[in-house]
Regions:
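Ampiphathic alpha-helical segments that act as solvent-exposed interaction surfaces
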Residues: 85-121
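Negatively charged, low-complexity tracts enriched in Asp/Glu with abundant Ser/Thr
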Residues: 2-54
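Acidic-enriched, low-complexity/disordered segments with a strong bias for Aspartate over Glutamate
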Residues: 5, 18, 22, 46-47, ...
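Preference for intrinsically disordered or flexible, low-complexity segments
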Residues: 4-8, 60-62, 76, 88, ...
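Amphipathic protein-protein interaction modules
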Residues: 47-99
Length: 121
């Protein structure tokens, strides 16, 4: 499946389900506040992904609990990262939570697609 610049995570997930059915393991949680709160707790409020930015949870992997977050600054700049939260309910150190930095939404969705196809097909 081709990912376009305009494609939202919701459209991407819908098309991946159309292509792969229930084997596709990413979804959009109806409630995201718990996940965002845990991310902020683990990173710390002074982290550059959090500080003066609006955070959204774009998608979650059911199989491995990875989550795609977008963080938007006041200037409209977006940071895209996949995080694997530890659920420690405290600030983490030493490379945790584990993360993958991505240059934008399209790259993030392509990363999810490519990893899914490599690991699950």
């Amino acid at each position: 499946m081709t990912v376009t610049d305009e494609m939202t995570a919701e459209v991407f997930i819908s098309r991946m389900y159309d292509t792969y059915g229930d084997v596709f393991n990413w979804w959009i949680p109806p409630e995201t506040k718990t996940f965002i709160n845990e991310l902020v707790t683990e990173l710390g409020a002074d982290d550059s992904f959090v500080l003066n930015r609006s955070i959204s949870l774009e998608a979650k992997c059911e199989s491995c609990d990875d989550m795609l977050f977008c963080s938007v600054g006041a200037d409209g700049s977006g940071l895209w990262r996949i995080y694997h939260l530890t659920w420690s309910h405290c600030r983490e150190r030493g490379g945790f939570p584990r993360r993958t930095d991505l240059p934008g939404r399209k790259a993030a969705l392509e990363y999810i697609r490519d990893n899914f196809e490599e690991e699950y097909l």
